[in-house]
């Protein structure tokens, strides 16, 4: 599951300063991210709050099922010390997104306290930045899944039971029982 988290004032997308943030609404953004992630078979849990505490609570509550986070922290980008700490506690990557180019705006917007806790940052591409963040996270997850074989029980070579003398009877301990093939030399190899 991908978490799509938007901070203060992003509920006003489409109304607030359209010359900076455009005319797309938060519903439009959520729909776009859901469509992008659906193409990879991933679900999206969207959340927006004007409260830093509510955002922290949401991230913590979903930390076990989250596979990635797309986060536009809004003005919390420049003020929150708790948000990057929370992101570092998550076992998944975060992509920080800003609709406008925060580095080309007022000097106080240039520093992101969140960026050091994020895997990447997308700024100044309008709401398309959300699409690119979703695409990147989904591709990362797909690549990881392709590299990671399904978990199978560990296979162990036969071992002598506890207390067996060298050259004595050889068996498998019950917890380590695995199927084996005997080759022409009589050696055992795991299947």
Description of each model-found segment:
Residues 123-161, 171-172, 176-191:
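A charged, well-structured terminal subsegment
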Residues 76, 81-136:
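Flexible, gly/pro- and Lys/Arg-enriched active-site loops
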């Amino acid at each position: 599951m991908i978490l799509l988290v938007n901070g203060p004032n992003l509920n006003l997308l489409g109304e607030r300063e359209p010359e900076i943030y455009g005319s797309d609404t938060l519903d439009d953004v959520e729909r776009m991210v859901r469509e992008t992630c659906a193409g990879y078979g991933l679900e999206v849990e969207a959340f927006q709050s004007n409260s830093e505490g509510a955002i922290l609570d949401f991230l913590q509550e979903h930390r076990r099922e989250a596979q990635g986070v797309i986060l536009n922290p809004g003005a919390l980008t420049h003020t929150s010390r708790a948000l990057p700490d929370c992101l570092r506690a998550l076992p998944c990557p975060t992509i920080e997104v800003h609709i406008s180019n925060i580095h080309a705006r007022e000097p106080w917007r240039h520093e992101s306290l969140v960026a050091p806790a994020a895997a990447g940052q997308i700024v100044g591409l309008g709401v398309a930045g959300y699409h690119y963040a979703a695409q990147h996270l989904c591709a990362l997850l797909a690549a990881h899944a392709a590299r990671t074989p399904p978990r199978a029980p560990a296979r162990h070579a036969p071992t002598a039971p506890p207390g067996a003398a060298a050259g004595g009877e050889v068996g498998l301990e019950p917890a380590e029982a695995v199927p084996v093939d005997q080759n022409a030399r009589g050696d055992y190899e795991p299947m």
